[in-house]
Amino acid sequence: MKRIISYISLFLFLSACAETQGVADALARQSAKTAVNTALSSRFPNVPAGLVTPFTDCVIENASAAEIISLSTAAVAGLEDEVVRLTGEVLSRAPTQTCVARASVDALTNP
């Protein structure tokens, strides 16, 4: 009986940790997304926001967990140059470029 209670307690503890981590990840991603969107919009002011957002999504989808944390931290600290640098690194990768190409076609064909 004690073993069953121990397993149930462990399961509940791990479930709570996973849920907390999911919330933290979502908050970091949202902060990073806002930072990337702001950086791209400021670097390309003539591009409508609707066209910048798909690029931002591609950057966030292809950034590593460490890059998401760095982008989020840089955003909070107001380090726009760091956000631009990290965004450029992620944009230079082939999977991100493929994502951006698809997003561009979608944005142009489905305004």
Residue ranges and their predicted role:
Residues K2-L10:
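Sec-dependent signal peptide recognition
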Residues S9, S31-A32:
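Hydrophobic, lipid-facing residues on alpha-helical transmembrane segments of integral membrane proteins
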Residues F13-A16:
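C-terminal motif of bacterial Sec signal peptides marking the signal peptidase cleavage site
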Residues A18-Q21:
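Bacterial signal peptide processing site
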Residues K33-L71:
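Post-signal-peptide N-terminal segment of Sec-exported extracytoplasmic proteins
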Residues F55-P111:
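Compact alpha-helical subdomains of small soluble proteins
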